[in-house]
Regions:
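Substrate-binding/active-site clefts of carbohydrate-active enzymes
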Residues: 8-41, 45-56, 62-175, 195-205, ...
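Short catalytic-loop micro-motif centered on adjacent basic/acidic residues
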Residues: 109, 179-185
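Active-site-proximal helices and loops of the catalytic beta/alpha 8
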Residues: 167, 173, 183-234
């Protein structure tokens, strides 16, 4: 999809290659399309071809560990926000892929799934209050979606919000990504996005690109650079 081993050197703002928003040429990468296993290493061999297209930002579909309970094998069913899906490779291999992208003048953003988790995420047992519940206390899927493989998160819980932001910071500070494409952003309250984007942009010496999947105008007030809605295709 297009849209308008050793100690790793920390990426700083001066060394980032992030393009201006109006100059973004974005390429979506589904790792499963590139390879059935070790996708990160395979993708690294195709960066010249991607660069040849004029791409200056790559958006990776979710690369995180996915759940096994009620699964439909969707990459949007996150079991652990800080762990790599082993079918794609290791975190060190992904760090190297990010570095290779940067060397070619390509920024990297990650698909971020903030609306829900898998049913076997550790939070289900450790923090039931972090999830939306029905009248008798059962955790539920996102209402009206039919997404039965995932559990809906409760954004009225401040501790859950902080844990989510902490996980997002990990990928910027430890892995070196340049921002996020935030999945189903319209389902997540403005108050969280404002808190999250402000916290991420406060990370010293880093610039970020933030893309929201949604049509709400308040995404821009929350600090997103861009958004898009599927209504445009109708």
């Amino acid at each position: 999809m297009y849209a308008c081993a050793g100690k790793r050197e920390i990426v700083t703002e001066e060394k980032q290659v992030l393009p201006a928003v109006e100059d973004v040429v974005m390429y979506e990468i589904n790792p499963r399309v590139f390879a059935l296993k070790n996708a990160f290493n395979v993708i690294s061999k195709h960066l010249d071809s991607i660069q040849f297209l004029g791409v200056n930002v790559v958006w990776f579909m979710p690369i995180y560990e996915i759940g096994e309970v009620n699964t439909v094998n969707s990459p949007y069913c996150i079991k652990d926000y800080k762990r790599i899906n082993p079918e794609f490779g290791t975190v060190e291999e992904f760090k190297r892929l990010v570095e290779l992208c940067h060397e070619k003048g390509i920024s990297v953003i990650l698909d971020w799934v903030a609306n829900h988790t898998s049913w076997d995420h550790a939070w289900i047992k450790e923090h039931k209050e972090w999830y939306t519940q029905d009248s008798i206390g059962n955790i539920i899927s996102p209402a009206g979606t039919g997404w039965n493989d995932v559990a809906d998160l409760n954004y009225d819980n401040a501790d859950m919000c902080l844990a989510m932001i902490d996980a997002m910071k990990y990928w910027i500070q430890e892995v070196g990504v340049d921002g996020f494409r935030c999945d189903a952003a319209d389902y997540v309250p403005y108050t969280f996005w404002k808190q999250a984007v402000d916290s991420l942009r406060a990370i010293p010496n880093r610039k970020l690109l933030m893309l929201a999947e949604g049509k709400r105008k308040d995404h821009f007030d929350a600090g997103f650079d861009m958004n898009y809605a599927w209504d445009l295709m109708e």
